[in-house]
Amino acid sequence: LNSKLNMRYAWKYTSKRNKLKNTFDEYFKHVGLPFLKILEEMGVKKNFRKIKNDYDRGSIRNINSITSFPNVLKTISNLKEQNKKLAIFTSKDEKRTKIFLKKFNLRFDHIECGKKTIKGKPFPDQINKILNKLKCSKKQAVYVGDMYHDYLSAKNAKIDFIFAKYGYGGLRILEIKKFINKFEELA
């Protein structure tokens, strides 16, 4: 899903309510990390819970700013017809993730969201949890992502990575050998 505009609205709302000086561009540099880690990286020192709640509220209020990349539903359907197991691994919280997926009628075999109880990106813990839940070996798995933290998560979990060029990251890392220009290239 393309949620950059939604993130911009949510950050503007949050910044105003909490008198934060950090720009959206500063925030966006860290997207992919768990939200509280982003705040730490930006030097925010207090009111984490209030800031997180305000961000979630601003994001949900602007849900209509989220769009789907072209051919996502069709591609997911094609992959399911090929008996591929599909999971979402996001740093977004579970509540917002489910709202966003419901809006676009997207269904996955597993949804793994940011949690306090397990290390998030770039650690491999959540990927390993997904593989365990889906009974999938590392050799069978591939992580498709568009941010540097996605790449690091896959590398740390020792699974293949495909960089989604159409996303946010604009990565130019020599180690990345596989990439797609459009989501439908997966099917």
List each language-model region with its residue ranges.
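N-terminal helical cap/lid subdomain that shapes the substrate entry/recognition surface
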Residues: L1-L73, Q82
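A generic structural signal for short
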Residues: F24, I63-N64, K85-L86, K115-K116, ...
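Active-site phosphate/pyrophosphate-handling residues
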Residues: L5-N6, K37, K74, K95, ...
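Structural motif
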Residues: H30, F89-S91, V144
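Asp-based, Mg2+/Mn2+-dependent phosphohydrolase catalytic module
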Residues: K80, E94, K98-A187
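Residue-level detector of anion-binding/catalytic polar loops
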Residues: K21, K85, D160
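Short, acidic loop-to-helix structural element flanking the phosphoryl-transfer center
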Residues: I60-I88, E94-K102, P124
